[in-house]
Amino acid sequence: KNPLGAAAGYGTTFNLDRQLTSTLLGFDGPTENVTDPITQRWEPETELAYDVAVMMDHLSTMAQTFILLSTREFNMVRLNDRHCTGSSIMPQKRNPCSLEVIKAKTSFAHGMLVSLLFAGKSLFMGYNRDTQWTKYWIMDLVDESKPALSVMTEVIRLLQVNKTQMLKQAEEEFGGATSLMEWMVRQGPLPLRKAKMVVEKAVKYSEKEGKGKVSYQSLKKALTEMKVPLSITKKNVEEMQRPEKILAQTSSMGTPSEKRIKENI
């Protein structure tokens, strides 16, 4: 909405055509009240700050995830040397500094958002000089946050992915138990609740066997105990827990199948 004509917050005695100036300047129309846009001079900055803070939250989540996956314990990705720095004393260190800075900038964005909200919480009706500082804060926020987008883009572009390690991790810790349960429901008729209880039992039995995925023997035992007359083979049980098979079957919109990921990109 067009604030032109509000003056210092109480309008003017000049006979202005506020609708005309709104049309000429490309606004949808003038503000209905002249006091509101002057009192609320902090609102546009705060709305932008909120959007930037949420964007930074997403980037920080990505940064945190990449840092974790790049550790020796996970070893799923390796950051490019461009995005790492050494230690002040430890020769072997590869500190993920670019990602850590993104996390720090996210905290800064949160602080700026809170500052803007506080600036608007105790104003008098009309003009307040307090809101002059909201202009400086929002410019600082944008300047500090803007580089994070290009940095994260480059991190992803240069990231080395350890597919072998990822596949190994995906095949462990019962990652295919859910897809196995869903397959059982489709083979039924078998209620989802019942199938879940069967697979839960099978997981416990498989854990006792020292397995990282549901074994054919444990699932057969669970089916027998739960009196579920479902015909399965060892091949079925193994096939439905393979990561490649799971991704191939996860084909609805927005899912992580290869086809859908390419569509999103």
Label every model-predicted segment.
Residues 1-121:
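Internal glycine-rich alpha/beta core junctions
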Residues 90-265:
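Glycine-rich cofactor/substrate-binding loops
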